[in-house]
Structures are given as structure tokens and as C-alpha cells.
Amino acid sequence: MIQFLTLIRFAFSFLLLTAFFCLYRKEYGFMKQFMWKMAMFQSARNLYAYLVVLMLIFINWCCHVTAPNLSVVVSTLLTLVLLNRRIAESTFHLLHERKRLWFATLLLSMVCYALPYMNSMSLFLFTVSVAAVFYPSEKVLSIKSHPEAINNPKELLALIIRNYY
């Protein structure tokens, strides 16, 4: 069991990176539906945030079982802070809107990945950074309230897709 959890822990970053490159700026049917629901429904954004936190809890558990250390405690506490919907939403918006902060978070994630015993912190920062990319921007959330866009949903979807990232 521990070998399997160790494999999950080390493969997680690469799987997340693969998913990122396969889905980023792609106009697949399910990605259009994902972008539409994330832009239009608060419940979809809440579900997305909770699924990210659930994924972080699982990864922290894997890190705790395979290599418990202080970094696991810190990343677990930060994950528990993200259980608050408002904090998670503001974190995703902040990282999505400010590209320099997003890049600094990714850079810090790579530094933590290179340091011994900081793997769980690296996984936390990397997951939050990738999750922030797929969270809708403030511009997209403001587009949905235009009165002329409400009359034509296909044009609204095209506008959302064009401005999502």
C-alpha cells in the first residue's frame, strides 16, 4: 500500500501537468460545457473549489502516510484554510488575475519540489496554481450580466470562451 501511495505522490505532479496541457485553451465539447457552467453558476464554482480541496486532502494524506514531516502539517493546514469557500475563491481569483503572483507560486512550487522533505508543500502550491488557471476571471464573470448577451446564448458562450483565460 505504501509503495502505491508513494507512486501516486510522485506521479501526481506529472498527471496534473499532463491534464493542464491537454485541456488549456482547448475547445472540446466538455471544456465548453465546463467553461459555461463555471461562468454562469456559483454552485459549479463552489463544487470546483471543493473538488480541488478534496484532491489536496487526498495528496496530503498520501504524503502523511509515506513521509510524515513538518511540511505535510503546513500544507494540510493551508488545505484546511481553503475549505472556507470565500478564501478558496479569492485565492483562485487572485492567482488567476495576477500573472506574476501565479508565476511566483509556480516557481516556489518548483523550489519546494527540489528541496528534500518539501514535496507536500510543492504539491499544494502546484495544485492551487493549476486550479487557478481553470477558474473564471472577473472579466468573464462580469460578461454574463450584460443585458444584450442574455438574449443570444451562443454568442455569450463564444464570448465566454474567448475571454475565459
Where on the chain are the PLM-derived regions?
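Membrane-helix boundary elements
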Residues: 32-68
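Canonical alpha-helical transmembrane segments
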Residues: 19-27, 49-64, 78-91
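Short, highly charged, low-complexity non-transmembrane loops/tails of multi-pass membrane proteins
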Residues: 140-165
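Membrane-helix interface and helix-disruption motif detector
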Residues: 1-8, 57-74, 92-96, 111-127
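Cytoplasmic membrane-interface regions of multi-pass membrane proteins
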Residues: 24-39, 83-101, 141-150
